[in-house]
Amino acid sequence: GISLSGDLYFYVNPLADRGRHRRQRWFECACCPPNIARLIAYVPGMVYARGRSSVYVNLYAASRAAVELDGGRVQLVQRTRYPWDGLVEIEVRPEGVEEFSLLLRAPGWSKPARIEVNGEGFGTAQPGTYFEVRRKWKEGDVVRARFDVGPALVEAHPHVTCNTGRAAIRYGPLVYCLEQADNEHNVWDLAVVPGTLRAEWRSDLLGGVVTVKGKALALDTSAWAGKLYAPLGEVQMQAREVEFTAIPYYAWANRELGPMIAWVRLAEQKVGQSA
């Protein structure tokens, strides 16, 4: 995991932390840092792919591309704020070629997405597939797709016992986490209330990110003082409702040290609530 400054690295990427992990400038055995740089340099070549008479859009990012097809070239101009916004527009500029296919990747996490050509409905892209738009193109044709990037909770397979009663927060393709810097109560003691998530753009935070906010129960664990185990139901915890803030997981550990957690507790257990 690379820092936002681009010069500090993790060799492991924990999904929960008590505030002890800090990125390092270098390692005695440092194969991962240069591989990160290599991957970043390679990403532009992963955005598009081509066949003899088809162009595949694999990744969504504001970009321009010139693609050689049988019979001519096509230039593509992609406009989007993805992953913060699910709207993607691709302007097509054919040069010497008229009929070919433009295939859009529909992410597996998304709901079915409406596809439009020049403002008119063309079809619906099903998650986990490529949606084909084949036609005779003209200069300035625009294909538009809107993917549902709204915040959601994701659960693990029941055999992943350490995540029982927990969920991860997702916004579009990004996994989120709760970091202490954004939350008043200990993030390890927060139980997120399902159905309360909302997204909020913060241009002043971590280089500009969408945060996910919602309601949580802040658990008072003081009744467990001096106990590691107790008969089921004997210890009664109190809780109060608070607001939590989650940030993209890639952006954690770029501020002061503090606890972090990605798989958050869900507010479904029986606890008393206090004002």
Regions found by a protein language model. Give the residues of each.
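C-terminal beta-rich recognition modules with glycine/proline-rich loops and embedded aromatic residues
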Residues: 1-91, 126, 135, 146-275
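Extracellular and analogous surface-interaction loops
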Residues: 90-98
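Beta-strand-rich binding/interaction modules
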Residues: 97-117
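Short strand-turn-strand beta-turns centered on an Asx-Gly dipeptide
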Residues: 116-124, 172
